[in-house]
Amino acid sequence: MINMIILVVFALIGLVVGYSAISIKLSKAKEQAETILLKAEQDAVNLRSQAEHDADHLRVTAERESKAQRKELLLEAKEKARKYREDIEEEFKSERQELKQMENRLTERATSLDRKDENLSSKELALEKKEQSLADKSKHLNEREENVTQLEAEKQAELERIGQMTIAEAREVILTETENNLTHEIATRIKDAEAQIKDTVDKKAKNLLAQAMQRLSGDYVTEQTVTTVHLPDDNMKGRIIGREGRNIRTLESLTGIDVIIDDTPEVVVLSGFDPIRREIARMTLEALIKDGRIHPARIEELVEKSRKEMDNRIREYGEEAAYEIGAMNLHPDLIKIMGRLQFRTSYGQNVLRHSVEVGKLAGIMASELGENVALARRAGFLHDMGKAIDKEVEGSHVEIGTEFARKYKEHPVVVNAIASHHGDVEPESVIAVIVAAADALSSARPGARNESVENYVKRLRDLEEIASSFDGVQTSFALQAGREIRIMVHPNKISDDEVTILSHKIREQIEKNLDYPGNIKVTVIREFRAVDYAK
């Protein structure tokens, strides 16, 4: 019994040990299977990567070969096209040569015929001249024959009269005749001398002007009425326009310049006849683009800042021009006035550059004539300064310039040169005449001026002057090439009810005094602001 139990126990132990061994083998088999599976997955990933790499390599190789083939075909096609073009051009060249030869032959024949025609005409004219000459000689001989007969009769009568005279009377007659003959001879010689002097003076004057023009060289560009501003990208156009167009309206109202935004990439066009306004608008717009803050309040701030910068630039332009011409010790106000001429045109010609050119020409001519060169250059430089303020002060630019020259104690020769350069008064010195001649040279040379541009600018200025002539008007701007006039009024002087009446009055004055194509839109703007500060 005990043996049976022992056998059973050993059997159970054997079963437990066998189960444990089997479990261990199963675990090892499972681990081996997992290892094999991981290795298989890694191999699969490696194989996939290798396959993708091989596929990419094959694709790149195929694309390279395809590009090489395309390039080769393209080069071959270009070579064929080049050869075909050369063949065609060679054919055209030969045909053109044949046509040129035919044209030359026809031209030679035509020239030969013209020459023969001219020879015949010349011979005919020569015969006519000979006939006319013979007729004139015959007529002259007849007249001389008549004169001789008349003189013989007069001499006979004179001899009869002298035969009845006393010695004193005969002496008086001889002296009278001698005096008459000498008077006639003297008058003839004086007349010949005057003609010779005039001819000599004309030649010397022409030589002097030619020398002055040859010794002066200047670069000029015709002034335009538009300015372009380049943008960093086209998205900036929307920011410049602003919500419902408020930014662009503010900029146009403050500067009086048309801001044109079209399909041209990365460009905004500023259009206006007044160069100072246009330059202020350009400076403001560039500052806004650089700053990035574009809204009405910022626009107003930068417009005011640009106006102050413009004053400094005007003074710098005047100083540079005065230094270039050698006009020393100019009054600061005169320097600023001359600087404003940089933004003033006359028939498309920049007035400041014109003034510098006149000063240089006057200096050259003065040196040739032995006059004061510095004074001539100064007078030529200042001769048109009245144009800088002719819109602000009553009178012509000559009258205004003369008045300011006297006000700032300029030399009397300079004052007279300014007053006389358009012939309003008589020149009192050689320098005044030189300045007038230099002004005519600078302005009348071909290409210096453009009358159509000046007429356009004058029409817009007249339009603004009509609007600004009414009481209560603060500023007025001609926009859209003169198709619109925008008027800003003082809110304390013009009420809302009077705005409509004012627009009608301005419209009536425009219709009465101006000739213009189409319609002109009259816009009157009354803006009232109340500002206070919280402390």
Curated annotation (Swiss-Prot):
It is found in: Cell membrane. Its main location: membrane. One of its GO terms (cellular component) is plasma membrane. The chain crosses the membrane at residues 4-24. Residues 351-444 form the HD domain. Residues 225-285 form the KH domain. Keywords: Cell membrane, Endonuclease, Hydrolase, Membrane, Nuclease, RNA-binding, Transmembrane, Transmembrane helix. Signal peptide: none annotated. Its EC number is 3.1.-.-. One of its GO terms (biological process) is mRNA catabolic process. CDD domains: HDc, KH-I_RNaseY. It is an enzyme of class 3 (hydrolase). Pfam families: HD, KH_1, RNase_Y_N. It is a single-pass membrane protein. Residues 103-149 are annotated as: Disordered. Endoribonuclease that initiates mRNA decay. NCBIfam families: HDIG, PRK00106.1, RNase_Y. This is Ribonuclease Y. It comes from Streptococcus thermophilus (strain ATCC BAA-250 / LMG 18311).
